[in-house]
Amino acid sequence: MPINVPDGLPAAEILTKEDVFIMEEKRAEHQDIRPLSIVILNLMPNKIITETQILRLLGNSPLQVDITLLYPETHRSKNTPEEYLIKYYQTFDSIKDQKFDGMIITGAPIEQMPFEEVDFWPELQKIMDWSKANVFSTLFICWGAQAGLYHFFGVPKYPLPAKMFGVFPHTLNRRDIRLLRGFDDIFYVPHSRHTEVRKEDIVKVPELEILSESEESGVYLVGTKGGRQIFVTGHSEYDPYTLKAEYDRDISYELPINIPQNYYPGDDPRQTPVVRWRGHSNLLFANWLNYYVYQETPYNLEELGNR
């Protein structure tokens, strides 16, 4: 089934060429079904790249999804033109009276800053609080996961001695959780971050459960009981060449950076990267959409406030 996006969105053209079923607003208006309503709070600098990555995964589900793109109004983007944001994105004030089946809060390359020093932190706190009564299930990614764990549960983040950078093996802590249905015993996920959340802090919070982790990259999936909030510390949505682009960028700026682990054959950056996370990423997003959004959300979204 298609994902419904704003008319003219550049990601639509890219994904259509990949044979992902995209439906623009005009055509979607004539569909006599209620699609899932998903709002994506995009905190990444390059909005087009991130929205394309996430829409690609949402479009691989048999469910029809209606997309609303959201950006923090209190932050001035240096990488995405304001005209683009005005044309394709909404502000919180414009959607705060609506209710959504699901929400995705992306990462942001600001994890070395204290949360309180991030210019849009007060707005993000307001949005996260709003999501509790107006969104059925929220998926937090990387820095977004750290922000959510800190805001709701006081879980701190810690600086790493070196950037966690590469594709790492993960295992499951539970096998009877629907979010994890179909996952391999060992699966791979890209990570790209300078900070971490720690297991010893999370296990102190009774509302939280660690669902998956890695000996190398630490905690990966954390969920609240019932799946209303899912925290993902890695980047399963990454394209095959995203880590390469980050590595090449840092090398060009002469920044200290290690070769991403388990990514290039023989750890040789001249080789073509090996993708080992595509199956996991599609399953993670499909399971979240199906089991935690579609199967659980009330048909009448106005009932959300009572749950």
UniProtKB/Swiss-Prot annotation:
What highest taxon heads this organism's lineage? Bacteria
What are the site positions for Important for substrate specificity?
192
Q: What class of enzyme is it?
A: transferase
Q: Which reaction does it catalyse?
A: L-homoserine + acetyl-CoA = O-acetyl-L-homoserine + CoA
Signal sequence span is none
Q: Which residues bind substrate?
A: 163, 192, 249
Site (Important for acyl-CoA specificity): residue numbering on this chain: 111
Gene Ontology biological process: L-methionine biosynthetic process from homoserine via O-succinyl-L-homoserine and cystathionine
Pfam families, A to Z: HTS
EC number(s) in its UniProt entry? 2.3.1.31
Which SUPFAM superfamilies does its entry note? Answer: Class I glutamine amidotransferase-like (SSF52317)
Alphabetically sorted, this entry's keywords are: Acyltransferase, Amino-acid biosynthesis, Cytoplasm, Methionine biosynthesis, Transferase
What is the purpose of this protein? Transfers an acetyl group from acetyl-CoA to L-homoserine, forming acetyl-L-homoserine.
Q: Which family does it belong to?
A: Belongs to the MetA family.
NCBIfam families listed in its UniProt record = metA (TIGR01001)
Q: What is this protein called?
A: Homoserine O-acetyltransferase
This protein's species is Desulfitobacterium hafniense (strain Y51)
